[in-house]
From Swiss-Prot:
Regulation: In non-stressed conditions, mainly remains soluble. Forms aggregates in response to different environmental stresses such as heat shock, oxidative stress and antibiotic treatment, and cannot assist Spx degradation.
Gene Ontology CC: cytoplasm
Gene3D superfamilies, A to Z: Glutaredoxin
Record keyword Glycoprotein present: no
Pfam annotation, one family: Thioredoxin_5
Record note on quaternary structure: Interacts with Spx.
Disruption phenotype: Inactivation of the gene increases the level of Spx protein and transcription of the Spx-regulated gene trxB. Disruption leads to an increase in hla (alpha-hemolysin) transcription and proteases production. It also leads to increased tolerance to the disulfide stress inducing compound diamide, increased peptidoglycan cross-linking, and moderate resistance to oxacillin and other beta-lactams antibiotics.
Gene giving rise to this polypeptide: spxH
Function: Adapter protein required for efficient degradation of Spx by ClpXP under non-stress conditions. Interaction with Spx stabilizes Spx and exposes the C-terminus of Spx for recognition and proteolysis by ClpXP. Involved in disulfide stress regulation.
Disulfide bonds: none
Result of changing C121G: Cannot restore wild-type level diamide susceptibility to the deletion mutant
Other observations noted: Goehring et al. suggest that the cysteine residues are important for the role of YjbH/SpxH in disulfide stress management. However, mutation of all seven cysteine residues in B.subtilis ortholog by Engman et al. shows that these cysteines are dispensable for the function of the protein and that the activity of the adapter is not activated or deactivated via redox-active cysteines.
Protein name as annotated: ClpXP adapter protein SpxH
Subcellular location: Cytoplasm
Length: 268
């Protein structure tokens, strides 16, 4: 489960000409086919909920040869190549692109890495992305150039595996901290608190019903991570929502999912 924590040289961010921000920047390098990356997405969702005013997360599909080769092998055209689809989604905003990849991971992991064009189209629309614009963007050669930029960033930060997170404080002259692999939630909160260097207040998560409506499709593991409730209590609350016809349970070989039956909340 655990990976490696190590300090990076401060040149990593400056060499790629990234402007400083007033928050902690977290670069998340992920593999859409990795179960550990799927688990980390729940942790990142919780971090964003609790520390939203202190952090900014940038998701980057790890452009390694292994990942890109698998993306190509799973596709029959640009329309079902998850790497190109993610870059095309980014052109309509990173928040929507992150929502898209979250929905795709919810589909990919339980279905044993199977990707179809219809699956991508459904996730694109559920993420609030204009489908026709997305299809046009998929035909543009600049997507490949964008992947090359991501590759440059990954090389500068010496990314060797996914998931990997790189934390930077607001001071561009400070060193970054790279966390390779998957760790318990408290490790990430400790890093954030240390980088802030002062007491910070956490936000509370939204109501369970609201969160599922926002995400549309969630796993038990994700909800247990977000809410930290006893599993028995969480199941009780989920059953209440199911009786109210607000959600439904979906069974997959790798676990149970809960799907919202409520109108989706549009991405901003």
């Amino acid at each position: 489960m655990a990976g490696e924590l190590r300090i990076m040289e401060n040149k990593s961010r400056e060499d790629i000409n990234l402007s400083p921000v007033s928050k902690i920047e977290i670069y998340s390098f992920f593999d859409p086919f990795s179960s550990d990356c799927f688990k980390l997405s729940a942790i990142l969702s919780k971090l964003r909920i609790e520390y939203n005013q202190y952090i900014r997360i940038r998701h980057i599909l790890n452009p390694s040869l292994k990942v890109l080769t698998k993306c190509q092998a799973q596709s029959t055209s640009n329309f079902d190549n998850i790497a190109l689809a993610y870059k095309a989604a980014e052109l309509q905003g990173r928040v929507r692109a992150e929502r898209f990849i979250h929905l795709m991971q919810n589909e990919i992991i339980p279905k044993r890495d199977i990707i179809t064009e219809s699956m991508i189209c459904d996730c694109i629309q559920n993420a609030g992305i204009d489908l026709e614009v997305f299809k046009d963007d998929l035909q543009k050669s600049k997507l490949t150039e964008s992947l090359k930029i991501d590759l440059h960033i990954a090389r500068e930060m010496e990314i060797e595996q996914a998931p990997s997170l790189v934390f930077f404080s607001e001071d561009v002259h400070e060193e970054g901290l790279k966390v390779e692999g998957l760790y318990p939630y408290h490790i990430y909160t400790y890093i954030i608190n240390e980088l802030m260097g002062k007491p910070i207040e956490k936000n509370l998560p939204p109501k369970l019903e609201t969160y599922i409506q926002q995400q549309q499709l969630v796993t038990m593991e994700e909800l247990l991570t977000i809410y930290e409730w006893p599993e028995k209590l969480l199941n009780k609350e989920l059953k209440k929502l199911a009786i109210q016809q607000k959600i439904e349970k979906l069974k997959y070989p790798d676990g149970d999912f809960w799907k919202s039956k409520m109108p989706k909340i549009k991405s901003k």
